């Protein structure tokens, strides 16, 4: 996993092209091997035609034209015409099929990245800007389009054409063939010198593109704060800095890339000139007919065109290797929480929850966040967790939902260790409402239905009524069909939380978890919500985290958490009677209300 970074920080990449990453592209070709085989068959046919055409030209010049054999000339011309038509048809088929296979591969790659990201732990998303994750799913995969759509298979065609042309050239005249290859070592040296600088340039470019994307994503998410503090100019200045970094990196990368072409083209032209010189002057004892000389020039083009094409592919490969490294780095991040090999589905539960001497720490050698937490909850009971910020309240419910695993001890539900059951079956019987409520773009009905995708409209309305969300929903322009923007920006904080609460209740979980679920709801809304919750909590084991003690006074048991330990435990009246930490917290809130 990449180290924690911000939009200003570049991510570390390999210095050299990672051949393993490039070979992994083959995994995405495998499902389409039948198509690829057909394409390769067409490629072989086209390569053979490209070799036959110069030879037929040689025969025409050396045999048909000098002897004025019109019959042979007509036959050769007709054969050339047929071969050219077949070649063009093959070219069209190859282009269309390669594009289709390439797009199918990209679709599969996007699917794998998106699916994999859904399984990654919270720590992955906490360790980097979301914009840097987004660019991997969209921009980097799109950048691979040309390489996967044409480059990979075309380079196979080019290599085959290169080899078969080389063989034919040596068969016709091995000495002239050697002269044709005389400048080839200079080409190899030119490519090797440039590839190191080009690889590094595109790594820097991908870093700067990632940083810019992360900054834009962050700026859009925080645009209200920017406008509130009138910091538009400062934001624009930072944007310009990031954008200039991208432009500078792009120009450096392109400058190096464009150095490749003049070198290849120059060596290609010099090779053809050398063939003419040797063939005409008889240098080195080479004696060839005019037809052979013309054919060799054609073969030289057949020889150098693939070399130029391979050079182009190599350019693309250098560019894409930096992006492939980022994509596969994401795919190689293993979820910290996975199903055990022998995991079984959690059966329908009653809701007994046991924390047995639980110890938790984020890092193996880090400090303990929870210390020997021992908590036993009977089915249907409501447990409230209170205490100062950072005491470990949210960590307790994260362990219950198995977003993290305990370091020592165990968490069980109806006697089943949560590590021994499948994640889907565990979380399917839980309803979790986090402090940071998320509303998806779509209408209100779809957002509530997210808790149970096959829910009827009647069930949706019933859930909304239960949490007293129905009235405000009906006051919206289109009621339940009112379209809300991403993150529910057109709704108030309280309305967003009520919709999210209805979503959780619609799932009808056996265990209900509310993490600061009413922290952004005004007192009047909270009172309406509390009235609906009183009967909905019955029959469900419920865990409630709340800073407002008024929302948990009716809890069956209240646990005061401090420094990762349960320091007080009992109901509201019992804890007040002890005049301990809970009593002091209650008194401080009551004093604030009086003021």
Segments predicted by a language model, with ranges:
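Helix-loop-helix
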Residues: 65-75, 168-182, 252-325, 330-331
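ABC-type nucleotide-binding domain
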Residues: 339-340, 346-595
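Hydrophobic/aromatic residues in alpha-helical transmembrane segments
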Residues: 53-57, 94, 113, 164, ...
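Membrane-integrated ABC transporters
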Residues: 1-50, 65-76, 93-98, 102-105, ...
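Alpha-helical transmembrane segments of multi-pass membrane proteins
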Residues: 83-102, 149, 153-160, 179-205, ...
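Transmembrane helices of ABC transporter permease
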Residues: 31, 35-48, 78-79, 83-89, ...
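Short intracellular "coupling" helices and adjacent cytoplasmic loop segments at the cytosolic face
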Residues: 4-13, 103, 111-141, 214-238, ...
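An intracellular "coupling" helix at the cytosolic face of ABC transporter transmembrane type-1 domains
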Residues: 33-34, 122-123, 139-148, 152, ...
């Amino acid at each position: 996993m990449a180290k924690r970074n911000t939009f200003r920080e570049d991510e570390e990449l390999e210095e050299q092209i990672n051949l393993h990453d490039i070979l992994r592209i083959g995994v995405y070709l495998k499902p389409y091997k039948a198509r690829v085989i057909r394409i390769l068959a067409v490629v072989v046919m086209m390569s053979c035609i490209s070799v036959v055409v110069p030879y037929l030209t040689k025969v025409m010049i050396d045999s048909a034209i000098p002897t004025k054999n019109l019959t042979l000339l007509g036959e050769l011309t007709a054969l050339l015409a047929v071969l050219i038509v077949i070649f063009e048809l093959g070219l069209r088929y190859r282009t269309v099929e390669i594009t289709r296979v390439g797009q199918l591969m990209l679709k599969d790659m996007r699917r794998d990245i998106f699916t994999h990201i859904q399984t990654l732990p919270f720590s992955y998303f906490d360790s980097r800007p979301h914009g840097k994750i987004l660019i991997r799913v969209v921009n980097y995969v799109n950048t691979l389009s040309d390489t996967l759509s044409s480059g990979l298979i075309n380079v196979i065609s080019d290599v085959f054409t290169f080899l078969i042309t080389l063989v034919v050239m040596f068969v016709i005249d091995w000495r002239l063939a050697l002269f044709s290859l005389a400048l080839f070592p200079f080409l190899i040296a030119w490519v090797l010198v440039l590839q190191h600088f080009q690889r590094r340039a595109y790594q820097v470019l991908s870093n700067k593109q990632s940083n810019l994307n992360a900054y834009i994503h962050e700026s859009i998410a925080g645009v209200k704060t920017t406008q509130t503090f009138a910091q538009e100019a400062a934001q624009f200045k930072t944007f310009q800095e990031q954008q200039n970094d991208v432009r500078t990196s792009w120009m450096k990368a392109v400058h190096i890339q464009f150095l490749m072409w003049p070198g290849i083209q120059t060596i290609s032209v010099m090779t053809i000139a050398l063939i003419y010189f040797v063939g005409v002057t008889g240098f080195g004892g080479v004696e060839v007919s005019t037809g052979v000389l013309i054919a060799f020039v054609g073969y030289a083009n057949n020889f150098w065109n693939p070399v130029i094409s391979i050079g182009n592919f190599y350019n693309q490969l250098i560019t894409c290797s930096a992006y492939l490294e980022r994509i596969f780095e994401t795919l190689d991040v293993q979820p910290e929480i996975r199903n055990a090999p022998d995991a079984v589905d959690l059966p329908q539960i009653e809701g007994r929850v046991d924390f047995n001497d639980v110890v938790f720490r984020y890092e193996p050698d880090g400090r303990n966040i929870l210390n020997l937490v021992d908590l036993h909850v009977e089915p249907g009971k409501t447990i409230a967790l209170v205490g100062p910020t950072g005491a470990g309240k949210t960590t307790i419910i994260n362990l219950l939902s198995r977003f993290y695993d305990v370091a020592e001890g165990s968490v069980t539900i109806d006697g089943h260790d949560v590590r021994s059951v499948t994640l889907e079956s565990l979380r399917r019987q839980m309803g979790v409402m986090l402090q940071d409520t998320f509303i998806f773009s779509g209408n209100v009905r779809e957002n509530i239905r997210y808790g149970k995708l096959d829910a009827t409209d009647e069930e949706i309305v019933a859930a909304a009524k239960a949490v007293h969300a129905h009235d405000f929903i009906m006051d919206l322009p289109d009621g339940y069909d009112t379209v809300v923007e991403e993150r529910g920006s057109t709704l108030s904080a309280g309305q967003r939380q009520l919709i999210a609460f209805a979503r959780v209740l619609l799932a009808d979980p056996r265990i209900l978890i509310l993490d600061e679920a009413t922290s952004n709801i005004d007192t009047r809304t909270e009172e309406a919500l509390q009235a609906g919750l009183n009967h909905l909590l019955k029959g469900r084991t419920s865990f409630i985290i709340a800073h407002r003690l008024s929302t948990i006074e009716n809890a069956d048991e209240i646990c005061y958490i401090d420094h990762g330990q349960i320091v007080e435990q009992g109901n509201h009246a019992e804890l007040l009677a002890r005049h301990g930490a809970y009593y002091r917290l209650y008194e401080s809130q009551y004093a604030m209300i009086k003021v």
